[in-house]
Amino acid sequence: VLPLAGFKKIQPRVYSGFYPVDSNDYQESKKALDKLSLNDNSFTYEPESSQSLGHGFRCGFLGLLHMEIIRERVQREYNLEFLMTVPSVTYRIEDKKGQTLDIRKPSDLPDDNSLKCYYEPIALISIVTPSQYLGSVIELCTSKRGAQQDLIYRSNMVEIRYEIPLSEIIYDFFDTLKSASKGYASYDYDIIDYRESKMLRLDIHVNKKKVDALSQILHKDCLLYTSDAADDTPC
């Protein structure tokens, strides 16, 4: 059987680790995820293990809403509970030998001494908003490391286009945009490129031991902010 001309498999944009709350549910969890992947070709999973959380799965989704839908379906249809790691996008690295590698989870990131460049996925996002909320929307996009590409007025509405790192969109962008526009703005985006960026891995230690499942890959500026916030938090 040959695929239809022009057919392209949907690639996940967001990844998260799913670890059964009860380790005895691993095989049942695998069967459940397998069934879900058969009727949703945009959902992917593969086995992975964590020193702190044990055996689980690295799952791929179209976005956070898709991830939440899968989690709710597994809970409702199969009565299974998961611990979920912080969602992440696929980063790309180049080592000093000139080899490139895609990184889907922070714990796979090699030692900094062996790396030459980090690359992160960039999205072209198109936002339509009433003109009175334009200032708030621009402020939001700028805070997300966005670069304005276009601004088009359409009667009392405005379409504004920005290039923004995908990692800045997948978390709270939708909720913040709705708040900034009183619920009137809408948006759509496509991944257009990978670009060099200053990324670092943030490791979390509990009782002086690194918890690999809690590691995150963050932009250098965000990491400095996170570090300052942690310093202000009492132990």
Model-derived features: positions:
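Structural and coupling elements of P-loop NTPases
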Residues: 1-227
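Single conserved hydrophobic/aromatic residue that forms the stacking wall/gate
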Residues: 225-235
